Design a protein with these regions (language model features):
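Juxtamembrane intracellular "pre-TM" segments in multi-pass secondary transporters
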Residues: 1-5, 186-223, 244-245, 411-412
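Short amphipathic helix-loop junctions that connect adjacent transmembrane helices
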Residues: 29-46, 236-253
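Conserved MFS/SLC helix-loop-helix module at the cytosolic interface between two early adjacent transmembrane helices
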Residues: 61-100
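Helix-to-loop junctions at the C-terminal end of transmembrane segments
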Residues: 63-75, 267-281
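Helix-breaking motifs and short loop linkers at transmembrane-helix boundaries and internal kinks
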Residues: 75, 96-101, 113, 247, ...
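Cytoplasmic helix-loop-helix junction between adjacent transmembrane helices
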Residues: 106-146
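A membrane-interface helix-boundary motif in multi-pass transporters
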Residues: 159-172, 362-388
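C-terminal transmembrane helical hairpin of 12-TM major facilitator-type secondary transporters
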Residues: 282-325
């Protein structure tokens, strides 16, 4: 049983890693690709990239709760394998996309199959207990970190043979992972813990509204929402910001993302396993959010390219907050509804991705345009810092309410 659990954890980690590699492959070359296809400047390319992210996220927002609910009915294994196969098909399509319309179509397909994160997170929740829950969820961040090391490097190296080659490689990885999972991945959700599929709970709004029955999740979900939203200041604009302000090349962007990946991997894969149990979830969340805020603000005032690499340190250290938030939220939901919860959380993340990229990229495009009263390419980072401070406030309110409830129960 223990060996099966370890094998399953390894598979889930590799699955998430491959997902992020596919994403990381695109980032360094996307500005150049969009400018080449559409013959536009950096600001307009940034805005177009925001709408591509919008297409991906809007689709994922709609399908994530459906995938989560299907995994609660049929189990995690078949849904996860289906998502992996679909991701492979998506990359094959993108490898031959001749126009921007085909890229948009590919992003829509990726939004549907990208819900593999939903099932993977539910799988982790199934096989975790209170002692290792935060550490196991830290693997998600570690996969992001390693993916951001490997993905941009693959994109840079294989891109030398043509812009489509990295997508073919990503498709091959997805299909290999599908075959591996088909033979070694056990089911994590026993039949007596499954429930019937309910369309009312399988829509993004319904899934979120259903979470109202858990008393303290409201404030924690708002805190999580603000963290996700703030992250798009970086996710949507890093390449365009560094090109505009420092004149970085795709190679330099790829190296910087490799540094991000290395730092995130260390924090999520190693540091959270030591620091989070020592600090506890509440203090990990507070300290992490403050570090996030500091790093985000410093990005906006950086005056030289090397400063961006230095300022990555406090920002990435803030990553201790993510697993602690995830662990706190999942601990308040019973095992029968973990799939639904993860679907709702993925929908929440996707909702911020529907809002965040257009807001952050258009704010960036405006702040560097002649129409802006002041040239301020760091404007999205300043907005992100404000959102992160708001997240810390909502987390504080949630924990204060939780403590008051515990005291009330003791008195009664």
């Amino acid at each position: 049983m223990q060996s099966n659990r370890k094998a399953a954890i390894k598979f889930i980690f590799v699955t998430l890693l491959i997902d992020v590699i596919g994403w990381g492959i695109i980032i360094p070359v996307m500005p150049s690709l969009l400018k080449q296809i559409e013959h536009i400047d950096t600001g307009h390319a940034s805005s177009l990239n925001g709408w591509l992210l919008f297409a991906f996220s809007a689709t994922q927002f709609l399908f994530a709760p459906i995938i989560g609910n299907l995994s609660d009915k049929f189990g995690r294994r078949p849904i996860l394998l289906m998502s992996l196969f679909g991701f492979g098909l998506d990359y094959i399509l993108l490898s031959w996309a001749p126009t921007i319309e085909w890229i948009f179509l590919g992003r829509v397909i990726a939004g549907i199959t990208g819900a593999s994160f939903t099932t993977a997170a539910a799988y982790i929740a199934d096989i975790s207990d209170d002692k290792n829950r935060a550490q196991n969820f830290g693997m998600i961040g570690a996969a992001f970190g390693m993916g951001f090391i490997i993905g941009p490097v693959i994109g840079g190296l294989l891109g030398g043979f043509g812009p489509r080659v990295p997508f073919i490689a990503a498709a091959a990885l997805c299909f290999l992972n599908f075959m591996w999972g088909y033979f070694i991945l056990p089911e994590s959700l026993s039949k007596d813990h499954r429930r019937e599929f309910d369309w009312r709970r399988a829509n993004p709004v319904g899934a979120l509204l259903h979470l109202k029955k858990y008393p303290d999740l409201g404030y924690l979900l708002v805190a999580t929402f603000l963290v996700y939203l703030a992250a798009h200041a970086i996710q949507s604009n890093w390449s365009f910001y560094t090109i505009e302000k420092f004149g970085w090349t795709p190679t330099q962007i790829g190296i910087s993302l490799g540094v991000v990946g290395a730092l995130v991997g260390v924090v999520q894969g190693l540091l959270t396993r030591v620091v989070n149990p020592w600090l506890g979830n509440h203090r990990s969340i507070y300290i992490g959010l403050i570090l996030y805020t500091i790093g985000m603000f410093l990005f906006g005032i950086a005056s030289a390219g090397w400063m961006m690499l230095v300022f990555l340190v406090p920002y990435c250290l803030g990553g201790i907050a993510g697993p602690a938030l995830q662990a706190t939220i999942t601990s308040q939901v019973n095992v029968r509804e973990q799939g639904e919860l993860q679907g709702a959380l993925t929908s929440l993340m996707s909702a911020t991705s529907v809002i965040g990229p257009p807001v952050m990229t258009n704010l960036f495009a405006y702040s560097i345009s002649p129409n802006s009263p002041i040239y301020m390419p760091g404007a999205p980072f300043f907005l992100g810092a404000i959102l992160l401070l708001g997240s810390a406030v909502f987390a504080f309110i949630a924990f204060r309410h939780s403590e008051e409830k515990k005291k009330s129960l003791k008195v009664n």
